[in-house]
Amino acid sequence: MEFNANRVDEANAVITATLTKDSIENNLEKVAKQAAKTMNVQGFRKGKVPVAVVKQRYADKLREDAEADGIRKILADGLKLLDIKNSDLIGEPSVTKFDKKDNGDIEVELSVACKPNIDLGDYKSLVPAVKAIEIDIKKIDDRLTEIAQSSAPLEKIARKRAVKDGDFAVIDFEGFVDGVAFDGGKAEKYPLQIGSGSFIPGFEEQVIGMKYEEQKDITVKFPESYQAKDLAGKEAVFKVTLHEIQERAKPELNDEFAQKMLPGQKDVTIDTLRDRVKEQMLAEDKAKYYRDELKPVFLETLVEKINFALPTSVIEQEINYALNNKIRTMTEEEINELKENANKVEDIRNELKEDAVNSVKATFIIDALAKAENVQVSDQEVTQVLYFEAMQMGQNPQDVIKQYQQAGYLPAIKMSMIEEKVISKLLDEKLGK
């Protein structure tokens, strides 16, 4: 059997071999004998089925298995020759050539992707300059006022007037599609905050200007993406009655309010709450500063300065992913043009390649940085983040986590969390110097 194994670079290898007809036939004989031991065939006792019968009935499947055994041996021999461990592989090696010859031989080529060897060098010198975050006292007081207003009780307005933006309009409503009332479209004495965007687009705007006890027909159209499929995209008429207008009571920023917001803590004053809000705002602003300003600069510098070989197959996967996303945004006419012209597809792939290379390179660098900095993210941490986000969106956390698991998104989420964690650690160190 002709055989050749070469390292293209540290991250890629190619193994070529000729799988001879004789070796395939020998493998086929072994596979057939093994199958005969366990196969149930009518007219024969289990384990006593003649090999010739097995070959006759399952010829195609047995030949596929025999060829696969040959490929596995080629791979094993190639990896051994190149001193590549299975733990060094990225994904499954791909069969890039499988050429059946007239004489029964098969010319095989296998492409192997390996974990790259990354020398980070003095990576901490590449961390960008970090400035300390400061919060204006007025912004802190504005946030305190927002918190107080959101928790203040609703009160009926002292003087009757028309509804304006920001009001809580207490309304009765009932919705109809094609003159027929639909489930979930009716409520009484419902406090709708105007401008909250909690109702169907266009509804709240038409409540503005209504007066006490006024009745009005409001016409809106359900979004195409509306969760109730029987209503999605349809026009609806809501019969609305305004009963009263409410607004938040004017909050008092005092020690009593602070004690309500920080229950169970001793000696709480409004200054205690102000300090707590300041800490939260500093953390929020720092996270935004790191994410939006410093992280892109840092990643760009890392990708530019740290060089190493990249696995070709991983880059191709990234290009395929980007290409599929791009196709989803195309019109039917544009997609048909691509189907008719393979060169256009290749042109797009070439356009996407640079970003794909940088993305793959950044991922490997982050992984290496995480190991160097001993940064880890547990499965429990991933679950906690998803749980919290689901609760914020009013969704069932268990359902959301299950959906992410089934879609195979958890590894990507973990990698994203590792990235944020290791970059924040390095930026914090820079800030502290």
UniProtKB/Swiss-Prot annotation:
It comes from the Bacteria. HAMAP family: Trigger_factor_Tig. This is Trigger factor. It catalyses: [protein]-peptidylproline (omega=180) = [protein]-peptidylproline (omega=0). Its EC number is 5.2.1.8. Involved in protein export. Acts as a chaperone by maintaining the newly synthesized protein in an open conformation. Functions as a peptidyl-prolyl cis-trans isomerase. It is found in: Cytoplasm. Consists of 3 domains; the N-terminus binds the ribosome, the middle domain has PPIase activity, while the C-terminus has intrinsic chaperone activity on its own. InterPro entries: PPIase_dom_sf, PPIase_FKBP_dom, Trig_fac, Trigger_fac_C, Trigger_fac_C_sf, Trigger_fac_ribosome-bd_bac, Trigger_fac_ribosome-bd_sf, Trigger_fact/SurA_dom_sf. One of its GO terms (biological process) is 'de novo' cotranslational protein folding. The lineage of its organism: Bacteria, Pseudomonadati, Campylobacterota, Epsilonproteobacteria, Campylobacterales. The keyword Lyase does not apply. Residues 166-251 form the PPIase FKBP-type domain. Keywords: Cell cycle, Cell division, Chaperone, Cytoplasm, Isomerase, Rotamase. PANTHER family: TRIGGER FACTOR CHAPERONE AND PEPTIDYL-PROLYL CIS/TRANS ISOMERASE (PTHR30560), TRIGGER FACTOR-LIKE PROTEIN TIG, CHLOROPLASTIC (PTHR30560:SF3). It is an enzyme of class 5 (isomerase). GO terms for molecular function: peptidyl-prolyl cis-trans isomerase activity; protein folding chaperone; ribosome binding. The gene is tig. Its main location: cytoplasm. One of its GO terms (cellular component) is cytoplasm. Belongs to the FKBP-type PPIase family. Tig subfamily.
